[in-house]
Amino acid sequence: PFTATFFAKHALLNILTRYCVFDVEEKLLVMRPYQIVATERILNRILVSENNKDMLGTLRAGGYVWHTTGSGKTLTSFKTAQLASQMEGVDKVMFVVDRKDLDYQTMREYDRFEKGAVDGSESTAVLARQLANPDCRILVTTIQKLACFIKKNKGHEVYAQHCVIIFDECHRSQFGEMHVSITKHFKNYHLFGFTGTPIFADNAGSGRNFNLRTTEQAFGDKLHTYTIVDAIRDENVLPFRVDYIQTIRERDQYEDQKVYDIYREGAYKAAARVDLVTNYILDHFAQKTKRSHGYSFKGTRVMGFNSILA
């Protein structure tokens, strides 16, 4: 079945011409099957909604891809942006990342994929010029810079153009005011998100905007899934073991009350909890990693100390 599918003329031609990438070290990267499928789902959604103008500018024109951490989301999402920019009728493709993710190495990688697409400056002036330039069909920007541009340019011509906006790591940072700004100003848009940790109703927690609490509410349908279970099965990521440790004990003197949610960040970062978790890790490190006595925390410290004195 693999050879019949892989070596089919149209499949092999697509892989060679559309789904291969050279990185900054001139290394040839061939996209994996799940990456190709996710890309095709997005391109198909763009094509369908372009032929149905009622879908443009709505959630039905977009969607999100759930690919686990370590499965190559950034390559998939950027290659999707590159191919989308080549589609007839698409004016602009914006590949949006968080500021903290746009380091020098990442910029080199993006620039390798699309020369001149990425701008690492803090100024929105370059972004404004890129958006106004009809020859600049694909660009990489940050969430923060795009938000600043929208705030300063209320009547920009790009808002009326056919735009594809792709978010890499579409977690909570895209919710709220940023999402509202995009959907309010852009008229003919497709909104796509890539995430390894989608937010569902049962893990959404509290938020100011009840209509944007989940990933689906912000981006639309789930277009493709490749979870950690799939990645471990395919040996694309290392397997791991999870031990659940009880950190909260019920007390009889407290009466249960129904609340919408708790202050999770405060609970997670409480000094007492952090201290207990840290001590547990140190105390059980050798046991969990199956190290010998000589490599225990105490043994390592003593041996290192002696070697320094020697």
Region annotations inferred by a language model:
Residues 1-94, 101, 105-116, 134-137, ...:
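ATP-dependent helicase/translocase motor core
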Residues 66-67, 91-99, 296-310:
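Conserved RecA-like ASCE P-loop NTPase motor core of nucleic-acid helicases/translocases
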Residues 68-69, 171-173, 185-204, 235:
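Conserved helicase ATPase motor motifs in RecA-like P-loop NTPase domains
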Residues 89-91, 136, 161-162, 186-190, ...:
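Short glycine-/polar-rich loops that comprise or flank the Walker A/P-loop
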Residues 97-100, 120-129, 143-148:
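Conserved helicase motor
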Residues 100-102, 144-147, 171-172, 196-201, ...:
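Conserved nucleotide-binding/hydrolysis micro-motifs of P-loop NTPases
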Residues 156-192:
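SF2 helicase catalytic motif II
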Residues 204-306:
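Interdomain helical connector at the RecA1-RecA2 junction of SF1/SF2 helicase-like NTPases
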